[in-house]
From Swiss-Prot:
Top-level taxonomy: Archaea, Thermoproteota, Thermoprotei, Thermoproteales, Thermoproteaceae
Family: Belongs to the asparaginase 1 family. GatD subfamily.
Stated name of the protein: Glutamyl-tRNA(Gln) amidotransferase subunit D
Catalytic activity as recorded in UniProt: L-glutamyl-tRNA(Gln) + L-glutamine + ATP + H2O = L-glutaminyl-tRNA(Gln) + L-glutamate + ADP + phosphate + H(+)
Domain Asparaginase/glutaminase per the UniProt entry, residue ranges: 73-400
Quaternary structure and partners: Heterodimer of GatD and GatE.
GO MF entries: asparaginase activity; ATP binding; glutaminyl-tRNA synthase (glutamine-hydrolyzing) activity
Matches recorded under InterPro entries: AsnA_fam, Asp/glu_Ase-like_sf, Asparaginase/glutaminase-like, Asparaginase/glutaminase_AS2, Asparaginase_C, GatD, GatD_N, GatD_N_sf
Top-rank taxon, per record: Archaea
Active-site residue numbers: 83, 157-158, 236
Alphabetized Gene3D superfamilies for the sequence: 2.30.30.520, 3.40.50.40, L-asparaginase, N-terminal domain
Length: 417
């Protein structure tokens, strides 16, 4: 039960809404209202002249008309966390996660394919682990075994690029696309991007000719087009913008235009729909380390002490580290740890032949990973160590498997151009 109130401030401003209960993170000196437009607003108690109770409200039960029968092959929705499938009661401010396909049909304005929805886990994306990548991969495979035309994975955006890359390596071939989708704006905000992103992801899995791991999110800050990025070539580039996800060193594989309900494939180079062939194991003893000026070598040596089997370094420029950590890098390699190099610049590619420092790293046994993104390299290292013998891993890392690296850099794609 919640209270609807009128808050009168000392300066004469008046607000009406539902008073939200405090949480463990709330400031005890703040009163929070859920306004009619869906936004929350907070007031310091010292600014409030009067609070007038206007009545009580109850949580509205979830209801939706039964979805009509839809013909065709099913699309599976696998929920892993995040707010994209949450329903918000604008009266009480309560958030209700729902996997009801009837409700989905209603909020999306229809579905172009029959839907099955399941929950895999309920995790903040920062709590994802390589072990959970394996769990998600197994559930994706189960969906395909049940006849799914495609699988939509609902995922928090902060680490979506890691999971997308992991699934790209896990599935050598698949009967359909694996589309990861999320929302930058939670569904209790008028500017939410959840509905359009999900609608686009379902369209991709139902219609696309390719069968790859992709990220489906807004291409622009408006609602005119949604981009479909390769899972190994995408990165979250802004903390809050709707168009935060960008393809790096390449362009999106497809675009979805909601006004025309048009899915436009932008390349003829892709993995086609086929049989199911996957390996869902990932090694947890892998580290991703960013080099910085003044880095203490003990930080790298500590990775050996905790049993790391693989280390991906984000080096400067062409893929360099400071002279002071070279002995630590050599110590890791001499102990049998696989060490690979990516670049902090993201765009461009690692080249350890240009400067002496790069050649020193090569002579130690550091593996240059061309134009592979650091997060993608981390996922590939985890997958390779879990599924191949140690002596095979360097070859696997430098062999293109899921379009994660290219033979040349296209200057026209720098900065998303």
């Amino acid at each position: 039960m919640y209270k609807k109130v009128r808050v009168v401030l000392e300066n004469g401003d008046v607000f009406e809404g539902v008073m939200l209960p405090p949480t463990q993170f709330s400031d005890s000196d703040i009163v929070v209202l859920k306004l009619k437009n869906g936004y929350n607003v907070g007031f310091k108690k010292g600014r409030i002249k009067e609070i007038v109770e206007l009545g009580e409200v109850q949580t509205a039960p979830l209801s939706a008309k039964p979805m009509p029968k839809i013909e065709g092959e099913k699309v599976w929705l696998l929920a892993t966390g995040g707010t994209i499938l949450s329903r918000v009661d604008y009266v009480t401010g309560g958030v209700y996660p729902t996997l009801s396909v009837d409700y989905l049909f209603e909020v999306l304005g229809g579905l172009e394919a029959p839907i099955e929805a399941e929950e895999v886990t309920a995790k903040f994306s920062e709590d994802m682990t390589p072990a959970l990548w394996g769990v998600i991969a197994e559930r994706v495979a189960e969906a395909f075994k049940k006849g799914a035309r495609g699988v939509v994975v609902l995922h928090g955006t902060d680490t979506m690029q890691y999971t997308a890359a992991a699934l790209a390596f896990a599935f050598k071939s698949a009967p359909g696309p694996i589309a990861l989708v999320g929302a930058q704006r939670s569904s209790d905000r008028p500017s939410t991007d959840a509905v359009l992103n999900l609608k686009a992801a379902i369209a991709v899995t139902a219609r696309a000719p390719f069968a790859e791991s992709v990220v489906v999110m807004h291409k622009t800050s408006g609602d005119t087009v949604v981009a479909v990025h390769r899972g190994t070539r995408v990165r979250k580039m802004h903390t809050s913008r709707r168009d935060t996800f960008q393809s790096i060193n390449t362009t999106p594989i497809a675009e979805y235009y909601p006004e025309k309900e048009l899915l436009q494939v932008l390349t003829d180079v892709y993995k086609e729909r086929g049989g199911l062939d996957y390996t869902a194991k990932f090694e947890e003893a892998v580290a991703l380390v960013k080099f910085y000026p003044g880095m203490h070598p003990r930080l790298l040596e500590a990775l050996l002490e905790v049993g790391m089997k693989g280390v991906v370094i984000e080096g400067t420029g062409f893929g360099h580290v400071g002279e002071g950590v070279l002995p630590a890098v050599k110590k890791l390699i001499d102990a049998g740890v696989i060490v690979a190099m990516t670049s902090q610049t993201l765009y461009g590619r690692v080249n350890l032949y240009v400067y002496r420092r790069g050649r020193e790293l090569l002579s130690m046994g550091v593996i240059p990973l061309e134009d592979m993104l650091p997060e993608t390299a981390y996922a590939k290292m985890s997958w390779a160590l879990a599924n191949f013998k140690r002596e095979e891993v360097p070859r696997v890392l430098t062999t293109p498997i899921a379009y994660e690296m290219s033979p040349r850099s296209d200057p026209l794609v720098f900065g998303g151009l």
